[in-house]
Amino acid sequence: MARKGNPISVRLGKNRSSDSSRFSEYYYGKFVYQDVNLRSYFGSIRPPTRLTFGFRLGRCILLHFPKRTFIHFFLPRRPRRLKRREKTRPGKEKGRWWTTPGKAGPIGCLRDDTEEERNEVRGRGARKRVESIRLDDRKKQNEIRGWPKKKQRYGYHDRTPSIKKNLSKSLRISGAFKHPKYGGVVNDIAFLIENDDSFRKTKLFKFFFPKKSRSDGPTSYLRTLPAVGPSLNFLVMQYFFNTKNQMNFDPVVVLNHFVAPGAAEPSTMGRANGTGDRSLQKRIRSRIAFFVESSTSEKKCLAEAKNRLTHLIRLANDLGFAGTTKTTISLFPFFGATFFFLRDGVGVTNNLDAREQLLNQLRVKCWNLLGKDKVMELIEKFKDLGGIEELIKVIDMMIEIILRKRGIPYGYNSYFNEVQKMRSFLSNRTNTKTLIESVKIKSVYQSASLIAQDISFQLKNKRRSTHSIFAKIVKEIPKRVEGIRICFSGRLKDAAEKAQTKCYKHRKTSRNVFNQKIDYAPAEVSTRYGISGVKVWISYSQKKGGRAISETYEI
C-alpha cells in the first residue's frame, strides 16, 4: 500500500524536470531566496491586502556572483478585470496611461482619484512582470529578435531557502556568497550594517526608518515597517555591486509607490475630500520632498535651483498632481524609476562628453514625459549654476523601466525598443555582455513552495486560523491548478494539549499516481506553542493546449 505522506509522483524525474507549462520559482527566485530576506521578498511580490502594502513600483534587487550580476526589476501589469469594471462604471475616468494608446509618459501619471480605484488597479488579479537583467562577462552572442521567443524553464532542484531574521547573518551563510574570493566582501557588508553609525545617520536611512524600534541592535530597523525590509535589502546588494565592480556612486534612491509614514511634508493645498485623498497627498508630497533632498546639494550655488524645483513641485501639487489636462505639470516620471547619483572626480564621471550626453538624454526624457518649458529651463539652470565640473550630484546614469500601455507580447515594439537601448547602455558602461529577460508571472498562488512559506509566516504571527488561511488560498489559485491539499500538524491552539493534524482539500487531489503532475513542498514554523508543520500538494491539470503559467521572452 502506498504511503500517503510521501507522494510517489514527487520523486519521479519528470515532475522535477523543466516544463514550459508549469510555474517554477527556481528560475528567478532561488538566488533571491538564498541571498535576500525571504519575508521581504515574498511581501514584495504578493498581491496587496488591507493589512499589507502589497506590490511596490520600482522594486529592484541586485545579486552579484563570481562571473555575472543579476538585477531583478519587479513591475506590475494591468489586471484583466479592469476591462469589465470600466464597462460597468461609465462615470469613471478612462483616459489612463495603461489603457490610452499613444500616451506620452507611461510613468507620467501614477495618481488614482480614489482609494477604490487604486485597489482596482493593484488588485489581487494584477499580473506581475519581472525584468531580470543579467550582466555576464562571458563571450556569449545574444541575437536581437523582433518577435519574442519562449524559452524552457530550469527544473526543480533545491527547494530549501535560508530564512534568517538577521540580514547580515543571512549574507554570511548564504550559499551563493560562500566563494572564498568574496568572503571578505560579504563580511564587510555585514560589518557596515551592524557597526557603521554614519550609514544609519544618512537622510536615505532616516527616510526609510523614521522611527527607531524599541528593540536594541542595528538590525532591529527591519521590523519597523513592512516596506522597510526590501528597501534595506536593495541598499545592501547595491553596496555589494559597488564594491566588486568599482562603480563609485552614492546609495541608489528607489522611490516606491508607498513610503514610510511620518516623512510627508506639510500640505500645500486645502482640505481633501476624504481620508484616502489626504493619505495619497501625503505619500506624493513625501516622495517629492525626498526627491528634492536627494537630487540637490547644500551648496549655495544650487540653492536657487533647489528653491525653483520646490516651487515647481508645489505648483504641480496645487494643479492636481499629474493630471491629464494641459495646465498640469506631471513630475511622476521620477517616481517608479531608479536613479544613480555619482560623484565628481571618481571613476567614469571624469568623462565630460559622456556626462553631457547623459544630460541630453535626460532632457529628451523630460520633454517626452513632461513636455513643459519650465522643466527644460530647470535642467539648464542646474548646468549653468555649478558647471559640469563643480556639480556634487548629477544624474549620470539613469536606468528607467518604461511601463507601457500593453504587456508582452502585445505592444512589443515600444517595449523592446526601450529594453534594447537599456541593454546597449549597460553593456557600454560595464564592458560586459548584457542579457535582458522578461518573465511574465500570472499568479503567485500556484507553487507549493511559496504557499507553504506564506502559511508558515501566518502561523508564526498568529494572524488567522487554519480554515481561514485555506479559504483565502482557494480563492487565489488559478484555473490551471486542478486541486490542492494542505495539512497542518502540531499544537495549533493554546487549548490543545496534544498535537493534532488537520487536512483540507479542494477539488481533485491525488498523491500517489504515477502519471500525475504534482508539486509538493513542506515547511516548519516555530510558534509559541511548539513546532508546527505544513505540507502542500498541488495537482496540475493534464489538459493540453492550456496557457503557460509563466513565460519567458527572449529579447
Curated annotation (Swiss-Prot):
GO CC, sorted alphabetically, is:
mitochondrion; ribonucleoprotein complex; ribosome
Cross-referenced Gene3D superfamilies:
Ribosomal protein S3, C-terminal domain (3.30.1140.32)
The UniProt annotation puts the region (Disordered) at: 1-20
The subcellular location is: Mitochondrion
One GO MF term attached to the UniProt entry: structural constituent of ribosome
Q: Which GO terms describe its biological process?
A: translation
Which controlled-vocabulary keywords does the entry list? Mitochondrion, Ribonucleoprotein, Ribosomal protein
Q: What is its main location?
A: mitochondrion
Family of the protein in this entry? Belongs to the universal ribosomal protein uS3 family.
Q: What is this protein called?
A: Small ribosomal subunit protein uS3m
- Organism of origin is Brassica napus (Rape)
